[in-house]
Amino acid sequence: HVMVEKPLAVSLDHAKKMKALAEKHNIHLLTNYETTWYATNHKAYDLVHNESMVGELRKIVVHDGHYGPKEIGVNDEFLDWLTDPVLNGAGALTDFGCYGANLTTWLMKGERPQTVFAVTQTMKPELYPKVDDEATIILTYPKMQAIIQASWNWPISRKDMEVYGKTGQIIADNSSDMRYQLGDDKPEVKLKPKSLEAHYNAPFAYLAGVVKGKIKPAPNDLSALENNMTVMEILEAAKKSSRTGKRVKLK
């Protein structure tokens, strides 16, 4: 079995080849995201789907990124790779857009968006001449919209998510703090969900659980191949949209 760091691949074409090989050899091909191990994200999913707390989903907003890979001091080898449009596929769009695509696909129980629209910019061309450092991706579903904000220009490092339903909102501020509010006339409630169980709270523990047969990933799990093929489809469409300036319909 194999676990790769997010995203699954540099392109949808590569992802399809990897998927074919994984299926041929009957192995799990898993993708690791830091946000998969956030108790707050799992609690948000639970409140939406198991407790039906906020009603039908209407909007998901995901913010990910920091103030730039060069600025935070990543090593030269990683920086060269991150800022190479061939090796990384794009800049902030792929580096941080993948998180929102992954979480949205999960919260939508594997449903693919109907359309993808993306706008990218390079705010710091002197640092990142070949790739974007700012990306906004909008996904549309029949009755839901997701906005993914991926950036190397945030003043702080962030990985947070907002989930809005017909009757309430849930905001996961980080890995341990979250809050929800069920209408104007209700108070905001703050939560600190307990840590996830062993095997579900860290990548190598999860991989070990899969290898030992203790965990059987469901198709829509955050690490699962099916979810991450949809992520790759979204990222590929986002790159096309940002190049053409047009919305891309998924087939």
Regions found by a protein language model. Name each.
Residues H1-T36:
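Beta-strand-loop-alpha-helix segment that lines the small-molecule cofactor/substrate pocket
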Residues G100-R179, N201, A205-K216:
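Contiguous beta-strand/loop segments that form the cofactor/metal-binding neighborhood of enzyme cores
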Residues M18, A44, A237-A238:
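Aromatic/hydrophobic pocket-lining residues that form π-stacking "cages" and hydrophobic walls in ligand
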Residues K24, Y206-K251:
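C-terminal helix-rich "cap/oligomerization" subdomain common to oxidoreductases
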Residues E23-I27, E51-M53, Y128, L139-Y141:
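Short helix-capping segments at alpha-helix termini
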Residues L87-T94, V189-A198:
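A short glycine-threonine-serine/GTX helix/turn-capping micro-motif
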Residues T36-L127, G245:
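Predominantly a Rossmann-like dinucleotide-binding segment in NAD(P)-dependent oxidoreductases
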